[in-house]
């Protein structure tokens, strides 16, 4: 099942470059995924009360052209039918109003036992309700990124209440916001990103002290977030 949604940018989604920020794009993708879940009757809040819920274990994002502040766009999403025992991918295609691709993304999804902090196997209905499709937006996914041994900058922040979601963890899109804190100023302002790969290992929670470290490699910048 493909789910489509039109999005009208709000003023808090614009960056100083006049483009929609990648943080806002990621939030839009996440919002549309939640709307798709509601359409299928998959109540994530009820799942959270039962201490077993969907989590995203990573993002692979390819940026072709960020929409400008006055440009509406549409998002198409679906669950991929290439399903493992413990994980699958949710596909996203962000397009301008003419249907031209602007952003392609994959979210790696699993179901987590929130008490034991361990993934659990999908049930017969977990993914079937989404009527998975074989289409994929990224033919050559980026492998997980190893943390560098040497860093060129770092910043320490404390996790706030506003960073926490209904699972009582830092929300998955907020980690990109944290990573932006150590990027070079010009890159942050201009938003000249071509690809972003996010790996999640362990969730941050309220009042955690997070050290955000920046490294530069031949492929680009790498940000690692450590819990003190």
Language-model segments: which ranges?
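Structured core of small recognition/catalytic domains
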Residues: 166-228
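Hot-dog-fold acyl-thioester-processing enzymes
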Residues: 1-56, 100-106, 113-194
């Amino acid at each position: 099942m493909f789910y489509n949604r039109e999005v009208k940018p709000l003023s808090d989604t614009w960056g100083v470059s006049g483009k929609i920020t990648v943080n806002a794009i990621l939030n839009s993708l996440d919002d549309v995924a939640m709307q798709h879940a509601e359409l299928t009757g998959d109540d994530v809040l009820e799942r959270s009360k039962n201490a077993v819920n969907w989590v995203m274990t990573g993002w692979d994002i390819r940026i072709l052209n960020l929409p400008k502040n006055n440009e509406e766009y549409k998002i198409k999403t679906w669950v991929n039918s290439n399903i493992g025992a413990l994980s699958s991918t949710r596909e996203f295609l962000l397009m301008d109003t003419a249907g031209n691709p602007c952003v392609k993304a994959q979210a790696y999804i699993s179901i987590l036992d929130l008490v034991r902090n361990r993934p659990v196997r999908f049930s017969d209905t977990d993914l079937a309700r989404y009527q998975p499709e074989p289409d994929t937006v990224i033919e050559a996914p980026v492998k997980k990124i190893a943390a560098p041994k040497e860093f060129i900058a770092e910043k320490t922040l404390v996790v706030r209440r506003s960073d926490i979601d209904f699972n009582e963890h830092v929300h998955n899109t907020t980690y990109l916001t944290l990573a932006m804190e150590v990027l070079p100023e010009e890159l942050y302002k201009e938003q000249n990103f071509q690809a972003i790969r996010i790996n999640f290992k362990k969730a941050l929670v309220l009042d955690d002290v997070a050290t955000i470290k920046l490294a530069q490699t031949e492929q680009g910048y790498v940000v690692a977030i450590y819990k003190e």
